[in-house]
């Protein structure tokens, strides 16, 4: 494991910690998309199905279990934990993932998986789904327009986690004994990173001018 992968994993954990602390301290989930969290739970469950039959390393196993449990706990806080759950607005967090994201990702997984077995299909599906899982969150923030400081830091940290994973892939391609090639993962990671760029742009402007982060609203989704 190289430094870029380690930093990426740390940033991913930090983003989860930021979100959970925001929920528990503020006692509300305004501006947080539970639909995005649910998509990530699907991503982790599909990708880490190998937990049941493959042991890579202690670190790998611990991280996989941590990601699954943490995202499940986050969903619990938003959906069920009072008083946080009382602030969840289902009418606003209404991106139709089951219509616009899951079916296309499933089709792509069938077209791009290496072999037609359950593990490879689920792994490919998880890559494509993660590449667009941020969309419900971005759409929700666009509707809300004014973004809380801690929420913006959560989204930025998520974007940085993915950016370091791309650096990890580049490093492995040039420095592994056998060049690391993962076309599906590369394309998925690139799509995911591109989706963050617009948010990064407005975040940088807000910081530069010392103003609150306010996103433009382009209509209903």
UniProtKB/Swiss-Prot annotation:
Top-level taxon: Eukaryota
Residues on Lumenal side: 1-2, 53-61, 114-120, 172-183
Subcellular compartments: Endoplasmic reticulum membrane
GO biological-process terms attached to the record: protein retention in ER lumen; protein transport; vesicle-mediated transport
Topology term for the membrane: Multi-pass membrane protein
Any GO MF annotation of the entry: KDEL sequence binding
Keyword annotations: Endoplasmic reticulum, ER-Golgi transport, Membrane, Protein transport, Receptor, Transmembrane, Transmembrane helix, Transport
Cytoplasmic side: 22-35, 81-99, 141-152, 204-221
GO CC entries: cis-Golgi network; endoplasmic reticulum; endoplasmic reticulum membrane; Golgi apparatus
PROSITE patterns (UniProt xref): ER_LUMEN_RECEPTOR_1 (PS00951), ER_LUMEN_RECEPTOR_2 (PS00952)
One Pfam family, short name: ER_lumen_recept
PANTHER family in the cross-refs: ER LUMEN PROTEIN RETAINING RECEPTOR
Protein function: Required for the retention of luminal endoplasmic reticulum proteins. Determines the specificity of the luminal ER protein retention system. Also required for normal vesicular traffic through the Golgi.
Annotated family: Belongs to the ERD2 family.
Name of this chain's protein: ER lumen protein-retaining receptor
């Amino acid at each position: 494991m190289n430094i870029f992968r380690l930093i990426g994993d740390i940033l991913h954990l930090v983003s989860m910690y930021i979100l959970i602390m925001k929920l528990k301290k503020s006692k509300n989930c305004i501006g947080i998309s539970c639909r995005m969290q649910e998509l990530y739970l699907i991503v982790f469950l599909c990708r880490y199905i190998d937990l049941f039959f493959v042991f890579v390393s202690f670190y790998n196993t611990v991280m996989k279990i941590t990601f699954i449990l943490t995202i499940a706990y986050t969903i619990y806080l938003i959906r069920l934990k009072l008083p946080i759950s009382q602030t969840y607005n289902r009418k606003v967090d209404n991106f139709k993932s089951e219509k616009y994201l899951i079916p296309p990702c499933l089709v792509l997984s069938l077209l791009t998986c290496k072999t037609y077995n359950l593990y490879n299909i689920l792994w490919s599906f998880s890559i494509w789904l993660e590449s667009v899982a941020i969309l419900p969150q971005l759409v929700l923030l666009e509707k809300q327009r004014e973004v809380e400081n801690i929420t913006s830091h959560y989204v930025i940290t998520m974007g940085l986690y993915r950016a370091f994973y791309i650096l990890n892939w580049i490093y492995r391609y040039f420095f592994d004994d056998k060049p690391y090639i993962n076309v599906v993962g590369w394309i998925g990671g690139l799509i995911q990173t591109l989706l963050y760029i617009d948010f990064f742009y407005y975040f940088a402007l807000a910081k530069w001018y010392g103003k609150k982060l306010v996103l433009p609203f382009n209509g209903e989704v």
